[in-house]
Amino acid sequence: MKRYLLSTFTIAAAALLVTSCNDEMDNGLKTGDEGTVTFTAQLPSEMGTRAFADGLTAKHLQYAVYEAGQSTPLPVFGDETRVVGEAEMVDLKKSVTLQLTSGKSYDVIFWADATTDSPYTFDPATQKVSVDYSKVNNNSDNCDAFFKKETITVSGNQSVDVKLTRPFAQVNIGTDDFDAAKASGLEVTQTEVVAKAFATLNLATGEVSDEADRTFTMKAIPTASDGEFPVAGGYKYLSMDYLLVGADKATVDVAFNYGGPQNRTFTNVPVQRNYRTNIYGSLLTNT
């Protein structure tokens, strides 16, 4: 028997108190003057547990600025040719400061992914992130990432909290017959998943495109350092993937290869952005 369980990521974040020298600056600027705007990009604050989906791999923060409703990136980083800012997230957050024109409205888009071995490329000219699935492996937290578009009307010197969220559904597979399968001669050491997922995300609109069957390449199964399977009951963690999905709830078929006599396919699996779906049961011996 297999079961599907859809549950939310912990996405609540405590309000941040931003203190800096900006607190003492005069906010009474006239329209057309420059204001100092400090953005604090924040991943969900209940993370940081050093397990899958802890957010700790998403340290590479990129951000770009546009006039509100426009798609041409602005060179606001002190160099006429530079249209993307970069910074390193520390303890799930990072504050960055921009000089923006008082009285004008801006869209600022943020993207945080892994510093190394990330399969994602951000193009500020299109406001899109693309996925290179040749770099996507099963059971890899380097595929975790977060985004947010923040629209702001500058009214002088100010601070803005920006709460980033995942554009993915996390799909986990676990079994309670791992030891029984091993005793019968089937020892599962690697797993692979094939499922439909998108390859492009528009950071300004949240829309996705280029859906196809994607292979999350065979890799070693999760270990204790990756955390326990999200469902209680002694389930062995066999597989974890991040699927780029649309904003609406959907269903996908998940093909699961574990090196057994035949692959398993789980049909009509519910997936939703920023939620996790857990597939679990006696999956290795109950075929």
Residue positions per predicted region:
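Sec-type signal peptide cleavage vicinity
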Residues: K2-I11, L17-T287
